[in-house]
Each structure stands twice: as C-alpha cells, then as structure tokens.
Amino acid sequence: MRLLVAAFLLLALGDLGPGGAVHFKDCGSAVGVIKELNVNPCPAQPCKLHKGQSYSVNVTFTSNIPSQSSKAVVHGIVLGVAVPFPIPEADGCKSGINCPIQKDKTYSYLNKLPVKNEYPSIKLVVQWMLLGDNNQHLFCWEIPVQIEG
C-alpha cells in the first residue's frame, strides 16, 4: 500500500519541474480547440521570462477546418496596447505542423519565444495566435508574464 501511495505522489508531483502545462485565456480560437499549452521553462505563473533567454512553446490543438497554410502572430500587450513580439519562425507549417491542416485532426505546434536583452523589465500579457487561410484563428491564447533582467 505504501508503494502505491509513493507511486501516486511521484506521478502527481512529477509535472512540477521546470515547465509544463500552463493556464491560459482563450482569446478567440474561432476554428480550433486548444488541448494544452506548454511553456518551458515556466515552473510557476506568471511565467518569469529572463532577458537573453529563449523559451519553448508547445500548443496541442485540434483544427475544426482544413487550411493550406498557418501563420503565427505574437503580441505583447502592455496597458491594453498590442505590441508586435517577433518570433524566429512565423510559418506554422515549419513549426511542427504538417500542412495542409486537416479538419478534426490534432496537431502539436512548436516554436521559440526569444526574450531580447533590450526588452524592458515589465509585466505584460503574451498573446499568441495561429492563423489559417483567410486569417481564421486556429488558436489564440494569452498568458501573463514578467520580463526580468
């Protein structure tokens, strides 16, 4: 019985490492459903993003439509103003997704979020959208972050 309890605790606490699923706000996934969002490393929320480092982003989602293409658009929202947040690869078809995207299929989107040294130390909201054909939102999520030196 003790072994069973110990095994359960290990499984339950195993996801408390350097990153894992984060709680997010869906900001309009009109033609898709987000199954899970992982930001690594992000052991606690709000995620603390350190200047000069890069963070991996993995979004598992299901598309409700077919789409020939996908494009990521990322913003930092500061005081209600959306400021473009450049990422290394905006083409979702080069970020873990085998295009064309098929209806009712689940995908794992992978990308990096680089935090440049020139960014100010500030609290903000990261908004990340993946757009399909005709700019339809395959997914859109927001999480609060803290950029630190």
Curated annotation (Swiss-Prot):
Keyword annotations of the record: Acetylation, Cholesterol metabolism, Disulfide bond, Endoplasmic reticulum, Glycoprotein, Lipid metabolism, Lipid transport, Lysosome, Secreted, Signal, Steroid metabolism, Sterol metabolism, Transport
Tissue/organ expression: Epididymis. High levels are found in the caput and corpus regions. Weaker levels in the distal cauda and in the efferent ducts.
Entry-linked InterPro entries: Ig_E-set, ML_dom, ML_Npc2-like, NPC2-like
Catalyzed chemical reaction(s): cholesterol(in) = cholesterol(out)
Family: Belongs to the NPC2 family.
Function: Intracellular cholesterol transporter which acts in concert with NPC1 and plays an important role in the egress of cholesterol from the lysosomal compartment. Unesterified cholesterol that has been released from LDLs in the lumen of the late endosomes/lysosomes is transferred by NPC2 to the cholesterol-binding pocket in the N-terminal domain of NPC1. May bind and mobilize cholesterol that is associated with membranes. NPC2 binds cholesterol with a 1:1 stoichiometry. Can bind a variety of sterols, including lathosterol, desmosterol and the plant sterols stigmasterol and beta-sitosterol.
Subunit structure: Interacts with NPC1 (via the second lumenal domain) in a cholestrol-dependent manner. Interacts with NUS1/NgBR, the interaction stabilizes NCP2 and regulates cholesterol trafficking. Interacts with DHDDS. Interacts with NEDD4L (via C2 domain). Interacts with NPC1L1.
Protein name, as recorded: NPC intracellular cholesterol transporter 2
